[in-house]
Amino acid sequence: MAPRRRRGAGQDGSDDGRSDSDAPKNRPPNTAFRQQRMRAWQCVLTPKLIVTVFSILAAIYLGFGAWLTYLAHTVRDLKIDYTDCLTSAPKDDFETIPQNHITAHFSAKDSTFDPYKAQWKTTEREVQVANYTDNRQFCIVRFNIPEDLQPTISFFYYLENFYQNHRRYVNSFNAKQLLGDAVDGKTINDSTCDPITHDPKGTGKIVYPCGLVANSIFNDTFSSPLALAVRNSSDSSRPYNMTTKGIAWPGLKDLYGKTSYSLDQIVPPPNWERRYKYGYQENNPPPDLKTDELFQNWMMLAAAPNFYKLYQKNDTHPMLAGQYEIEIESNFDVTVYKGRKAFVITTLSTMGSRNIWPGIIFLIVGGICLVLDIYFILSFFIWRPRKLGDPSYLSWNQPSAPGGHSS
């Protein structure tokens, strides 16, 4: 007689009468990763490991901090604040600039070309702009370079207390308009360019480029430095030519294009009046933003209220020690927001212009790691050495514990 099969038993002897092929389809695969059987390692923080880690961190941070500090001190620079030039400097006669307006970092000292003995004066003359002349005020600054500066020589302008990171200011532009598209008036009016969207004179023309950022562009102009006297040379009145080409990041030009607007559709921003007194004309057309690197640098908004922006540079020729003169057309009013402005002539290191703070921060962190390292060495190996895993330190082995005993 054949054995009786249990009720509900399958052909494979399973209790539910189903084969492996009938298993639920949402069952995770039987792998170490999916079934959480991966091998694991847990770091045990032994005294030797802690001391080793802090020693390595201290060496890295102190070494890197010392290197950054050294690089910062190899940079040579001269910074002159010319905010008060038009109001304080005499007209047509040079006067010494107050020393608190000058900051210099040079390794050489030369009484003949002392960087803190800069001079300034103001002058006024007519300037030809397109098809008309305009009366402009200039600040002329004479400054000294006590040692030869090797290229690249960079010329920055510096603004203080100007908040480009304000929420409304940051968004005040139209990206499509900057790319060259002829964006219609309604779109501009509804965009974040408000309130700089249309001609304030009521003509209905579109402001190009619209927005607060473009309207507030830094519009002081600087000439290339003119060498008046060079050490060990009889040459005089020799220009040290600088260029505004190559001062912006290469990728920025992809964000801009030549405008598709016709001249009768657009007007310049209100603060551009000195450059476009009679608006955009055939002989004074709107700028080609794709090639205007000064504009591109200005549109790269600064995160802090005090910032530098590159204006011009010289990549090829050294700037010899001597006396130089620079002419500044001062148009950008910083007094309305209690700010300051200056220009900076500087060399560059591997890490860029002079900035001592990264090196200081690394040295501070490295110093903290070193102090902790010394503390752990003294604590674990000199003051109170103890054996790891000693059962006598367990709470129930302490004499004060109930039923405890000393081992």
Swiss-Prot record:
Q: Could you tell me where the Basic and acidic residues compositional bias lies?
A: 15-25
Give the UniProt keywords, A-Z: Cell membrane, Disulfide bond, Glycoprotein, Membrane, Transmembrane, Transmembrane helix
Q: List the disulfide bonds.
A: C85-C139, C193-C210
Which residues are reported to be glycosylated? N131, N189, N219, N232, N241, N314
Task: List the transmembrane segments.
Answer: 49-69, 360-380
Subcellular localization(s) per the UniProt record:
Cell membrane
Tell me the subunit arrangement.
Component of a flippase complex consisting of DNF1 and CDC50. Interacts with DNF1; the interaction is direct.
Q: What is this protein called?
A: Phospholipid-transporting ATPase accessory subunit CDC50
Organism expressing this protein natively: Chaetomium thermophilum (strain DSM 1495 / CBS 144.50 / IMI 039719) (Thermochaetoides thermophila)
Q: What is the lineage of its organism?
A: Eukaryota, Fungi, Dikarya, Ascomycota, Pezizomycotina
